[in-house]
């Protein structure tokens, strides 16, 4: 049993979390996919239920779904009918393998002090010109939700400065109102960047 409340949440609630109904707009994913070559290789970091991977696969992309929770990976495998790699972000050790990396609502659990290393690993794993997408719950300081899950809650200014300092190019940030599993109104921060 993990002593990390965030990891424990996903272990203990994998089936409920994976089964929840998510009807998210596809505009961001469609824009991400449209910028990639046909049959591009995509790494999904934190695939959860596998919903996004399923959509990308249905569009003809070569997707490698991953999740840090073995229990959520099993749920995604049921949905996808294919293996899902159990991998924590800090285990990413690839060099110029992927055309795109998709991290929807997953890197928001990485401690701020660890984000530079994770962004470096993602940058290294992308091919030259590769595209990165991530989303975060916006804020000004680290904190926890009512389930005890850790969030890094970055601001757009803080996040853009960090990515720029690490060598990312063509960084775009957008914000949108939304929600999350906790049912609370949420300001979401969406990031797109290129290697």
What feature does the model see in each segment?
Residues 1-37, 39-48:
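Conserved class I S-adenosyl-L-methionine
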Residues 49-91:
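Class I SAM-dependent methyltransferase SAM/SAH-binding core
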Residues 129-136:
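Conserved beta-strand signature within the Rossmann-like core of class I S-adenosyl-L-methionine
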Residues 91-101:
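A short acidic, Gly/Pro-enriched loop at the edge of an enzyme's catalytic core
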Residues 180-195:
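Core SAM-dependent methyltransferase catalytic element
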Residues 143-158:
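Acceptor-substrate binding/catalytic loop of class I
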Residues 116-128:
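A short glycine-rich, Lys/Arg-flanked "PGG" loop and its adjoining helix->strand segment in the class I
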């Amino acid at each position: 049993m993990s002593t990390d409340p965030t990891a424990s949440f996903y272990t203990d609630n994998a089936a409920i979390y994976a089964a929840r109904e998510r009807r998210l707009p596809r505009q961001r994913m469609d824009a991400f996919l449209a910028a990639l070559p046909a049959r591009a290789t995509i790494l999904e970091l934190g695939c959860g239920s596998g919903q996004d991977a399923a959509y990308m696969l249905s569009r003809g992309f070569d997707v490698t779904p991953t999740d840090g929770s073995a229990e959520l990976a099993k749920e995604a495998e049921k949905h996808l009918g294919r293996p899902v790699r159990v991998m924590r972000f800090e285990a990413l050790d690839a060099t110029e393998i992927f055309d795109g990396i998709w991290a929807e609502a997953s890197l928001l659990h990485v401690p701020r002090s660890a984000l530079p290393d994770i962004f470096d690993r993602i940058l290294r794993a992308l091919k030259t010109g590769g595209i990165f997408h991530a989303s975060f719950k916006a804020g000004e300081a680290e904190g926890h939700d009512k389930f005890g899950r850790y969030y890094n809650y970055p601001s757009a200014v803080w996040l853009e400065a960090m990515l720029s300092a690490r060598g990312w190019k063509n960084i775009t940030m957008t914000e949108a109102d939304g929600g999350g599993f906790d049912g609370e109104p949420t300001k979401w921060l969406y990031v797109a960047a290129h290697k």
